[in-house]
Amino acid sequence: MGHDSDVRADIAHARRLVVKIGSSSLTDDDGRVDPNQIDMIADALEARMARDTDLIVVSSGAVACGMGPLELAQRPTDLATKQAAASVGQVLLAQEWARSFARYGRTIGQVLLTASDAAERDRARNAQRTIDRLRQLKAVPIVNENDTVATSEMRFGDNDRLAALVSHLAFADACVLLSDVDGLYDRNPAEPGAQFIAEVKSSKDLKGVAAGDGGRLGTGGMAAKVSAARLASRAGVPVLLTSTENIGAALDTAEVGTCFWPDQDRLSAWKFWVLYAADSHGQLHLDAGAVHAVTENHKSLLSVGITKVEGDFSQRDVVDLVGPDGNIVGRGEVAYDSAMLHDLIGQSTSDLPEFARRPVVHADYMSHYSNRAQLKG
């Protein structure tokens, strides 16, 4: 892809598209679901689907939509109240999406995910199959974080990160992030002299960009959107960031907003999952020689280079690889459980019994944090 117009054309003609809608785009000033706003969005989504686009909607707004009926003037800060608001808002939001798409004879399917669903490969695959089957049955998947059962603070960032992960899970050709901002600026667009950034080819284009916080109803903020866009880019998915007001043009020609180019050295599906979605079940501490071997020479990790094992993990679990300075240098899938590894620490392969001579982490099942660092501006 040599030109910005090429990337925008790819987004405009994507056969499989993820569209994320922000909280503020779905509610009125009182924090209640806005049927007119949802109809406007559904109209634009339907126009794109009429072009044979396979479309997945990531809809924020459950907590925001529950605030009005529960008479909450401010977005709740404690987890229990957030979950209560989400439990009310999810029902109202799903009803409105169903009503609006029914005007076109379409059925919706609600897919509620948590961060732990993405972290476990089997659960991630189940979510992937559910989304795929909904599309095969001509239903519109409406994806949201399952805020009501989250056991930790909601960490997807107004579903921006969730949209990036869904783009990866669904093998999307492009992702559109919609909110109340028309694109990326080098500072708060309300400030004099703020410069619009039309395209982001790499993290170098983000140097000096100051991203603000989320609004009253949302939790994302521009920083979360940029991070999510770069995350999707690492999976090879181009991203368009713009306002919901521009949804028509965004889904038609993509000649609006900020365009994030996909990385040319896209990560494999497995390495992407390991770096950005999987939970770590433990840590392997490496000596300097092992760090050099796995990060610079792309070699497998052998037991002789391990100085310490932390955590209680099973064979094929994902673990962090930690250097002598305490910094995590990568992640990988272990060939042995933690109990067995304690007996292998520091031993040369030739000194081990035959059944224990496999690499502790094979190079094919390892991903380095140098890849992850590319997300940072």
Curated annotation (Swiss-Prot):
Record's subcellular location: Cytoplasm
Annotated binding of ATP, by residue: 20, 179-180
Keywords, sorted A to Z: Amino-acid biosynthesis, ATP-binding, Cytoplasm, Kinase, Nucleotide-binding, Proline biosynthesis, Transferase
Keyword presence, Cytoplasm: yes
InterPro entries: AceGlu_kinase-like_sf (IPR036393), Asp/Glu/Uridylate_kinase (IPR001048), G5K_ProB (IPR041739), Glu/AcGlu_kinase (IPR001057), Glu_5kinase (IPR011529), Glu_5kinase/COase_Synthase (IPR005715), Glutamate_5-kinase_CS (IPR019797), PUA (IPR002478)
GO cellular component terms, A-Z: cytosol
UniProt pathway annotation: Amino-acid biosynthesis; L-proline biosynthesis; L-glutamate 5-semialdehyde from L-glutamate: step 1/2
GO molecular function: ATP binding; glutamate 5-kinase activity; RNA binding
One GO BP: L-proline biosynthetic process
Family under the similarity heading: Belongs to the glutamate 5-kinase family.
Identification of the protein by name: Glutamate 5-kinase
